[in-house]
A protein has these predicted regions:
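C-terminal beta-signal and adjacent terminal beta-strands/loops
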Residues: 534, 581-583, 689-694, 715-770
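Short acidic/polar hinge/loop motifs at secondary-structure boundaries
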Residues: 164-203
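Gram-negative outer-membrane beta-barrel transporters
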Residues: 467-470, 474, 483, 579-581, ...
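Membrane-embedded beta-barrel scaffold of Gram-negative outer-membrane proteins
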Residues: 96, 347-351, 357-375, 519, ...
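Short, acidic, small-residue-rich periplasmic hinge/interaction motif at the N-terminus
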Residues: 26, 67-71, 79-123
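Structural signature of Gram-negative outer-membrane beta-barrels, strongest in the C-terminal barrel
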Residues: 294-299, 308, 417-419, 427-429, ...
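N-terminal periplasmic accessory domains that precede
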Residues: 81-85, 133, 151-153, 196-199, ...
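Transmembrane beta-barrel wall of Gram-negative outer-membrane proteins
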Residues: 229-231, 236-267, 271, 275-314, ...
Length: 770
């Protein structure tokens, strides 16, 4: 065989062994070409061009690996003219399970406007309390007037206070922690060992009843695991702030695990009291203890029990008669805003078959609340030096002190059966609240008051999901509930006992929701829903009120939502547009109780109002690179309380409404930038915005809009993390509550009085995980 023949045979063999393989890589769903796909074999590599095309010199029997950020990596055998389809990976939010509904669903598939904070989000935001998450939630606000947020507004609907005489403990926004209803008790929202926070916007009454007419806030603490775990966190910061937390998790026996956590938190409260020469009159002194047990003897039965003690021994000294922005106060009587809650819950899930499950949820809580304050906000020295008010000349000292002590106990039991796409259940609740108040009550008519509310709630509900096809389904649920309320009140005037009040009422309420959901692909969904929520009626406590004005009826809200959700490997978008209509709105009015008696006008709650609301909510999460993540949220809200009239005195008709709802900023938003690298270094900055809003429905005073900027950076070294953080780094002054009334003697002109949110605070946190 000559040389030429041998060379030709050799080249032919080489061409077989090392042939040029070509092909195109496209998106499996859209079939659009993908640029920049990495293609590697054992000894060669390339990437696709702008048209998704590639060429590679490999044997046709070689194994090629195709990888691209945002897509699943696959291995294929090389052939010529390949057509490779890559499937997108869903961003982590697809894996987020929302627990608060009647059935657990992924965040992408749930047909509601929901903001979710995972354990990672909570840690990155440095949130020690739910208070610090509120600025990142579109269309959520909270009213100051307490040491920690208790009263929330979602889409402009929600209470601003619950002083003695303001009615029963009915709330428009539910606050639930580990299946324990703490509505109106949001001070207990400490973020220690919390794994997830879920905020539902819009009526959720068909799931949670009358306390969820405007929305629902749920906090879930970490569940015990079989593995050993131990965590330590310690913080020191300005305002004499320190925080120490511990977590321990262990397996006791097979199927039984325990998790124990505890936290001590303290700060002085950012106030300098001139009268008492102290800096801790507004202190936050908080303790949280929690124990959780998980028992799973087999694959069918799971029991999770939670026991919790929250003891918040906080002071309250947040107002000043000179409205200064230096956080100086002059009160000579110590205020208190404390909450001690002892609670437990037990959730049992039993799987009877692949399609049938039974769930039982039991909870009990008992809470002691004290809210007291110096009613005139100053001492005699201040009033004399600044306003020439001399007690010896006037014959009386300008001193007022109000105190309200509450004890609330609540027992709930829920039973639920899930049969395929059908869910049916029942709910029982017994709540008892006792109030003891002293001070200038009911415009000075009462000096001491005692009230007892006794609630019995019974409800039944059902939900069904019908699948028209693999991509289109209809979800419908309803809840019918009866409330029986008994109120007993006794009162003392300045020189005699006043007429006692005893009244009971019962009413039924219906909530429902229907939603169409279209799943465009594995990553994109749309929904359209219509829902009705409700808030229970109640009994007015005013001792001289006519019997016909004693009760007030339930309030209803009807809501239409359209939503869009897209969740990919490197970004997620959730957009909701909504409109709502409030019916039988509960408002505070006054009426002449005895004809011809000009002194018989008393304020009470009545169903005389209506209102509208509309807007949008947007949440965005974008992983730019493996090191950089951007987050953003936006809320737009347009509200209106329709005009209504009420009797102010014997000759004057007052006009209310015809303006936006109180505590309802038109715009809320946030933007976050997070960076971290492989060495353990990290940094994060957040900007939040809140538009101006009316402080109250009873006057036209408004807040100022404001931006806040927070910053943190640090380093992780093995199991330890050190974080330096700063909140409100530009020391912005922003009001969280405003009252409009006459305070300054001798003429007592009406003025706007403001209480401010936290100033700048800096600190250092050390976390260690075993």
């Amino acid at each position: 065989m000559n040389y030429i023949t041998k060379l030709c045979i050799s080249l032919y063999c080489i061409s077989i062994v090392s042939a040029q393989v070509s092909g195109i890589v496209v998106d499996a769903y859209s079939e659009q070409p993908i640029e920049g796909v990495n293609i590697i074999s054992e000894d060669a590599g390339t990437s696709t061009d702008a048209d998704g095309v590639f060429q590679l010199d490999v044997n046709e029997r070689s194994i090629l690996q195709f990888s691209h950020i945002g897509y699943h990596t696959i291995n294929l055998t090389a052939i010529n003219e390949m057509v490779v389809k890559l499937e997108e990976k869903v961003i982590d939010t697809e894996g987020i399970i929302v627990h608060a509904g009647l059935a657990e669903e992924t965040l992408q598939r749930i047909a509601s406007s929901v903001t979710v904070f995972t354990k990672r989000d909570i840690k990155e935001n440095g949130s020690e309390h739910f208070q610090f998450l509120t600025d990142y939630i579109p269309n959520l606000n909270w009213a100051g007037g307490t040491s920690r947020p208790r009263y929330f507004q979602i889409r402009g609907v929600g209470e601003r206070s619950h002083y003695f005489g303001e009615g029963p403990p009915n709330f428009s926004v539910a606050f639930v922690m580990d299946d324990i209803d703490l509505s109106g008790l949001g001070m207990a929202g400490i973020m220690h060992d919390i794994k997830q926070v879920e905020i539902f916007k819009g009526p959720q009454s068909s799931v949670y009843g009358p306390n969820a007419m405007a929305g629902l806030i749920t906090l879930w603490s970490a569940t015990p695991q079989d593995s050993f775990e131990s965590n330590l966190t310690a913080t020191y910061g300005s305002d004499n702030h320190y925080r120490l937390g511990l977590v321990g998790n262990a397996k006791i026996i097979r199927g039984l695990s325990i998790r124990v956590s505890g936290l001590k938190n303290y700060s002085d409260g950012f106030r300098e009291n001139i009268s008492k020469n102290t800096t801790n009159s507004n202190k936050r002194d908080e303790l949280l203890l929690r124990t959780k047990l998980k028992y799973q003897p087999n694959e069918k039965l799971v029991l999770v029990g939670t026991a919790m003690i929250a003891n918040l021994d906080n002071g309250y000294d947040a107002w000043a008669p000179d409205n200064n922005q230096d956080f100086k106060t002059y009160s000579n009587q110590q205020g208190q805003d404390s909450q001690k809650s002892t609670a437990f819950s037990l959730r049992a899930n039993l799987g009877l078959s692949e399609r049938m499950d039974l769930t039982s949820i039991t909870s009990y809580s008992e809470t002691d609340l004290v809210h007291s304050y110096d009613g005139d906000w100053a001492d005699d020295t201040y009033w004399y030096n600044n306003h020439n008010f001399d007690p010896e000349v006037e014959g009386w000292s300008y001193e007022f002190f109000d105190s309200n002590e509450k004890n609330r106990s609540s027992l709930t039991q829920e039973l639920r059966a899930s049969i395929g796409s059908f869910i049916i259940g029942g709910y029982y609740k017994h709540l008892k609240e006792q109030d003891n108040a002293s001070g200038y009550l009911f415009s000075g008519l009462v000096t001491e008051g005692k009230g007892i509310y006794d609630f019995n709630v019974l409800a039944g509900y059902a939900q069904y999901a019908y699948h028209f096809s693999s991509v289109l389904r209809l979800i419908g649920n309803f809840r019918y509930e009866t409330n029986k309320i008994i109120y007993t009140g006794t009162y003392l005037g300045y020189d005699a006992a006043l007429p006692p009040v005893k009244f009971d009422l019962e009413h039924g309420m219906l909530g429902f929701k229907g939603a169409f959901q279209y799943q465009d692909d594995n990553f994109t969904s749309y929904y359209l829903s219509f829902a009705q929520g409700y808030k229970s009626g109640g009994v007015n406590q005013q001792p001289f009120l006519a019997e016909k004005n004693r009760p007030f009826r339930p309030e209803y809200i009807q809501n239409v939502e359209m939503g869009f959700k897209k969740m990919m490997d490197n970004y997620s978008d959730r957009l909701t547009v909504f409109i709502g209509n409030r019916r039988n709105q509960q408002v505070s009015v006054s009426s002449q109780q005895v004809l011809g008696d000009p002194n018989s006008f008393y304020y009470f709650t009545s169903n005389t109002g209506s209102g509208q609301l509309g807007g949008l909510e947007w949440d965005h999460d974008h992983v730019i690179t493996s090191n950089i993540r951007l987050t953003a949220s936006l809320g737009y809200l347009d509200t209106k309380v329709e005009e209504f009239s009420y009797q102010m005195d014997s000759t004057t008709i007052g006009i209310g409404g015809n303006k936006a709802a109180a505590m309802a900023p038109k715009l809320t938003g946030s933007f976050g930038f997070d960076w971290r690298d492989e060495s353990g270094l990290f940094a994060r900055t957040d900007l939040t915005y809140k538009d101006n809003y009316y402080f109250s429905d009873s006057h036209n005073q408004i807040s100022n809009s404001y931006f806040l900027i927070n910053l943190s950076f640090g380093k992780t070294i093995d199991a330890a993390t050190i974080t330096f953080w700063a909140r409100n780094i530009f020391d912005k002054r922003y009001a969280i509550r405003g009252f409009y009334f006459g305070l300054i003697p001798p003429d007592y002109p009406d003025e706007l009085w403001l209480s401010y949110g936290d100033p700048r605070q800096i600190g250092l946190t050390f976390d260690y995980k075993l």
